[in-house]
Structures are given as structure tokens and as C-alpha cells.
């Protein structure tokens, strides 16, 4: 074991040395590469294709994140709208991967683009997601091949429940929750879905389904509810799509005007080549992204914790004429304690804080958001989930099956709390629930103060209930429906700023931090990931809802 440890240490040291030696070379090569930038001279057509988009990324000395950031996307589209030389935008549906929120956030800009530019969408397979992107265009075409089709379905939700399989191993995972709809972790403790969870998920799924139906009605003047539910639009060919008025015809890439040898560039090439306008304003609004689960660990690339939030907030001290801060939150929640520590740190800031919610701003994410003077959500943001949950596993039956005899001694009570080899007594369980109620009370106090709502009215919309942004606006959990740009503009307007510039605060990692985070990547089964989640969050009081991450 010692030899293996020494060998591993030697390998890591070697990697660090190699990286340090090669970094200057990478830097030089990067400088040469930058000289080959695409020229926009004579360019009239931009192909909008985007396979990867991130809300936030880490700046390190040895790596560059090649994915386009959310704000870079918005900036580039705004510039494109003002670029009189660009006459046509072609949306390549097969090369687009955007979330619901990202689609919503670019709608307004595409409406501006369509005023003086031709926008055409083309693709082979249109599902509900990609078709919503296609609806940004003035004209929708299928690629002229018999392989092109529509693939519209209703909705379904499935997830595995592990109680019985864990029982065969002698493992029991207990979940305690404050709030009937705070159902995180029930897939470990139950053998089937609770009615509360089913009700909550059906509410979200049905609303999203109706949103899609209504959007198609608005844009294409056709109701396709019956066709979808009957399965008629599963692998529906171009003839069916034209008949229903869902597309305008068939075409090839060349016929719609894609010619990379003449006047066409991809969107990312346009982003790298267009000339940025210099902003000489003295007024600054800072943007900080908080993305990922809220936890103390750094095992995942996207984690929100007190330390990395403090690092970002410390950078605000170096910004001259800082007028306000926009927090962009994209999180399903996590540690209750970490959420409170972040909340307290933000509370000390003497500038107005506005909140822009991404795909997710639920549980601990919403907890942090309550610090905001004004909260913006997208209509399809998942938010709320005001409640508390705790998971604690027991292995008493496991050691019995293995014929292991636990021997020891104690003086006093409470040693069964969070001892995985002891059954939890009712007395200890009551103490845990008392502590959870205290934490829940603190959560509600923040919401009551931030939203100016009575505790009685709050309970009607809390208890772990999850809401779409449009619903959260109706029940008072957010102030406005809008994009990141809308949030920024609102802050500037309320501050009465005639002009302003934006400064984006990024996390930073050293060479050693990047190398230490390097681990072999293996394909993980859903079960393994779930077990790792139990291990990570066991015995911690949580503001968390794991069901929302891949919803």
C-alpha cells in the first residue's frame, strides 16, 4: 500500500512539473493561433449552431474553457442585431443544445433580429426542445431527406426506487423532511412515489406541455394537442409536417444560403471575430454566477460554497464606482448551513443586489436569492422548494448479515444520532426534527422578510412545493419574469444610471488546484451516482431537491 501511494505521488509530481514546463509553450502557441482569426469582411450569413453553453466557468493558469458563456451569447446576439452587414441568420437545429431557460432568454433578441434580417431554421429531427428553437425563425425547413422527421410526444417521468434492493443488503436509508412536498431522498426510503411528489411533478410537466402547445398555436396557428397525444407526430415525415403547417418546406443547406467559401461563418467564429465596443462608463454593475449544488466539498466542477463565494465577493473591493450586483443563480440547493453562511456574507454588502434565476433556483438556491432586493425568474425556471430534508442511512442489518458484532461502551445519551451502526431512538429522532424545524423557521424568516408575506400565507406555497417561474411570480415568490439582461437593465434603471459597464467575476484556480482535481473518469450507473449522493449528504440538514437537476 505504501509503495502504491509513493508511486501515485511521484506520478502527480511529474504531471505538475510537465505542466509547469509546457505552460509557456502553450501560451506561445496560443498567441500564434490567435493570429488566424476569422475575418468578417464580406460575411452576410451567420449559422447559429451552439452545442455547449455554460452559466459559469473557472479561470485557471493552464486551461481555457472553450464553451461559450451565457452572457457572451447574449452580448454576441445583441451585436448581431445591430450589425447591418449581416443579412441572414440560419439556425442549424441539429447543432443546437440549449435549455428551456436559454431558449426563453434569447427570444427577445431574436425578435429584434427578425426586424431587418432573414432568419431560417433547418434540421432533420425536430423534438419539442429543438422545435422551440426553430420557432425563433421566420421560416422553418426540413433537410431534404426521407430521414427528416418530427418527434413530438406528451410527457413521462420515471425514476428508480431503491428501498427494496437496499434492504437485501441490510441497508435502511431514513429521510426526515419538514414540508409534505419536500420529497428529496424518498427514492431511497420508499418503494414507490409519494402522492405529493407525483402531484408536484405532474403540475410542472403539464404546465410545460401546455406552454409548448400554446407556443405552437401562437407561431404556427395550429393546435397539435390531439396529434401529439395520439402518437401521430412520432417520426412524422415532412409531408405530415407540411400538411399540419409545422414547417414551410424542404431544402438543402446550399439552397438556403450556407456557403462557407463565400459569405458564411459559424456563430462561434462570429463571436471570436466581431469587434467589441469599448465602454468608457465610470459606473459599474458586477455580475456573479453561482452555479451547482451548495456544499463544502470540491469534488464536482460546479459547486457553490462559502469559500468560493467569498473569493468572488472579495474581488468587488477592487472595482471602482461599483453601483450594484446581479447574482445569477442556477442551483438545486444543498447544505443548509452553507446557504446561511453565504446569505450572511451577502447581507454585509452595501450595494443593491438583484437576482437573476437560471434553469434552477430552488431550495438552498432560493434561500440565497432571498437576499436580493428584486428577484427575476424565467417563466420556465424551477424555483421554490422551501423546506428541509435530512438523509441518514443505517447499516444495523448489514452487520447482522455479515455476523459482525459491534462492541463498545458509552456514557450519556445521543450516540445513536448519525451512528450508521445503531438504530435511531424515538428520543433522538425528536431532537433531530426539533433542529430541522429551527432550520426551517430560519428559512421562512428570510422569505417572510424578503417577500413581505405572512407566515400563514407562506405555508400555503412552501412546504417543499416546487414552482415554475410563471407560477412563482403569481404567488409572490419572485418580482418579475425576465432574462439576465432584463434584470441588469432593471437594476440600472432603479439606480438611475444613464450609462454603465458590466464586470463579470469568475472563480480562479491555480495549477496545483487544477491538477489535484484531476481524477480518472469512469462511466457511472445511476445507482452508483445515487449511492455517492447518499454518502455526500448523509447526516446533513439540507435545503435540496435532487429531482430538479435533470428535470
Predicted region positions:
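Charged, glycine-interspersed solvent-exposed loop segments at helix/strand-loop junctions
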Residues: 162-259, 396-481, 485-490, 495
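Flexible, low-complexity junctional segments that flank or bridge functional domains
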Residues: 2-44, 82-87, 112-119, 124, ...
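C-terminal recognition in membrane/secretory proteostasis and scaffolding
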Residues: 328, 401, 504-506
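Short glycine/threonine-rich loop-to-helix capping motif typified by GTGT followed
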Residues: 337-342, 471-474, 517
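Intrinsic disorder and flexible/low-complexity segments
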Residues: 282-285, 289-322, 505-551
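Cleft-lining beta-strand/loop regions that shape enzyme active-site pockets
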Residues: 38-39, 43-159, 278-398
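C-terminal intrinsically disordered, low-complexity extensions immediately downstream
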Residues: 485-517
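Domain-scale detector for complete catalytic domains at protein termini or as standalone homologs
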Residues: 19-20, 322, 475
Amino acid at each position: 500500500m505504501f509503495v502504491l501511494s509513493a508511486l501515485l505521488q511521484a506520478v502527480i509530481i511529474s504531471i505538475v512539473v510537465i505542466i509547469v514546463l509546457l505552460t509557456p509553450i502553450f501560451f506561445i502557441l496560443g498567441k500564434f493561433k490567435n493570429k488566424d482569426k476569422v475575418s468578417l469582411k464580406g460575411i452576410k450569413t451567420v449559422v447559429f449552431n451552439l452545442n455547449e453553453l455554460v452559466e459559469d466557468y473557472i479561470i485557471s493558469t493552464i486551461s481555457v474553457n472553450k464553451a461559450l458563456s451565457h452572457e457572451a451569447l447574449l452580448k454576441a446576439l445583441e451585436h448581431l442585431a445591430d450589425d447591418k452587414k449581416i443579412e441572414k441568420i440560419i439556425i442549424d437545429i441539429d447543432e443546437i443544445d440549449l435549455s428551456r431557460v436559454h431558449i426563453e432568454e434569447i427570444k427577445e433578441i431574436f425578435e429584434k433580429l427578425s426586424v431587418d434580417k432573414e432568419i431560417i431554421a433547418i434540421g432533420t429531427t425536430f423534438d419539442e426542445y429543438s422545435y422551440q428553437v426553430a420557432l425563433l425563425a421566420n421560416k422553418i425547413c426540413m433537410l431534404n431527406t426521407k430521414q427528416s422527421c418530427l418527434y413530438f410526444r406528451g410527457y413521462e417521468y420515471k425514476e428508480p426506487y431503491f428501498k427494496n434492493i437496499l434492504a437485501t443488503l441490510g441497508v435502511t436509508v431514513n429521510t426526515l423532511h419538514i414540508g409534505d412536498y419536500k420529497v428529496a431522498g424518498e427514492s431511497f426510503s420508499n418503494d414507490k412515489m409519494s402522492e405529493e411528489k407525483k402531484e408536484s411533478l405532474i403540475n410542472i410537466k403539464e404546465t410545460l406541455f401546455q406552454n409548448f402547445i400554446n407556443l405552437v398555436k401562437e407561431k404556427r396557428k395550429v393546435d397539435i394537442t390531439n396529434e401529439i397525444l395520439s402518437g401521430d407526430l412520432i417520426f412524422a415525415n415532412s409531408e405530415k409536417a407540411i400538411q399540419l403547417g409545422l414547417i414551410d418546406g424542404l431544402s438543402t443547406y446550399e439552397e438556403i444560403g450556407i456557403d462557407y467559401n463565400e459569405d458564411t461563418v459559424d456563430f462561434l467564429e462570429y463571436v471570436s471575430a466581431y469587434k467589441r465596443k469599448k465602454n468608457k462608463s465610470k459606473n459599474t454593475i458586477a455580475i456573479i454566477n453561482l452555479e451547482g449544488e451548495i456544499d463544502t466539498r470540491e469534488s464536482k466542477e460546479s459547486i457553490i460554497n462559502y469559500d468560493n463565494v467569498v473569493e468572488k465577493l472579495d474581488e468587488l473591493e477592487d472595482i471602482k464606482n461599483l453601483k450594484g450586483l446581479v447574482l445569477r443563480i442556477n442551483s438545486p440547493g444543498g447544505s443548509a448551513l452553507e446557504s446561511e453562511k453565504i446569505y450572511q456574507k451577502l447581507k454585509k454588502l452595501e450595494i443593491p443586489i438583484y437576482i437573476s434565476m437560471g434553469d434552477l433556483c430552488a431550495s438552498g438556491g432560493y434561500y440565497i436569492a432571498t437576499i436580493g432586493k428584486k428577484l427575476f425568474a424565467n417563466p420556465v425556471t424551477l424555483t421554490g422548494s422551501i423546506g428541509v430534508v435530512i438523509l441518514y442511512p443505517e447499516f444495523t442489518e448489514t452487520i447482522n448479515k455479515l455476523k459482525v458484532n459491534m462492541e463498545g461502551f458509552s456514557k450519556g445519551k445521543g450516540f445513536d444520532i448519525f451512528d450508521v451502526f445503531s438504530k435511531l431512538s424515538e428520543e433522538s429522532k425528536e431532537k433531530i426534527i426539533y433542529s430541522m424545524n429551527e432550520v426551517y423557521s430560519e428559512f421562512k424568516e428570510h422569505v417572510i422578510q424578503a417577500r413581505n408575506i405572512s407566515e400563514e400565507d407562506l405555508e400555503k406555497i412552501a412546504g417543499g412545493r416546487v414552482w415554475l417561474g410563471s407560477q412563482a411570480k403569481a404567488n409572490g415568490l419572485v418580482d418579475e419574469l425576465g432574462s439576465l439582461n432584463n434584470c441588469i437593465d432593471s437594476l440600472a434603471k432603479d439606480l438611475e444610471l444613464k450609462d454603465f459597464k458590466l464586470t463579470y467575476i469568475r472563480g480562479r484556480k491555480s495549477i496545483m488546484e487544477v491538477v489535484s482535481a484531476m481524477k480518472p473518469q469512469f462511466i457511472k450507473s445511476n445507482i452508483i451516482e445515487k449511492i455517492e449522493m447518499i454518502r455526500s449528504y448523509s447526516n446533513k440538514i439540507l435545503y435540496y431537491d435532487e429531482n430538479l437537476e435533470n428535470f
